[in-house]
């Protein structure tokens, strides 16, 4: 996401690759990537890590090898404030 220009850059690239029939995959940031892959015509693989799970109130769920994308506003995630506080720099 960060090297393609964020969500807007992804959508521009997805339009080009979709027209050419070229598959697109993501690298890192599954909490964002899951959403853009849902609207990518040639979505291929979503790279998955569970790294953010300890700091989310409701970690993403997988079913039959596929992510269940939250339908909540924004990114669909909510931070566990107590868990996040453990990692704060003081």
Question: What does each model-found stretch correspond to?
Answer:
Residues 1-66:
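Shared catalytic-loop signature of beta/alpha-barrel
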Residues 56-90:
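C-terminal extensions of enzymes
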């Amino acid at each position: 996401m960060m090297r393609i220009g964020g969500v807007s850059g992804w959508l521009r690239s997805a339009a080009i690759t979709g027209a050419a029939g070229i598959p697109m995959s993501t690298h890192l940031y599954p909490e964002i990537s899951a959403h853009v892959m849902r609207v990518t015509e040639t979505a291929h693989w979503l790279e998955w890590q569970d790294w953010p799970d300890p700091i989310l109130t409701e970690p993403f769920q997988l079913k039959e090898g596929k992510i269940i994308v939250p339908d909540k506003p924004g990114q669909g995630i909510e931070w566990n404030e107590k868990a996040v506080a453990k990692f704060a720099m003081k």
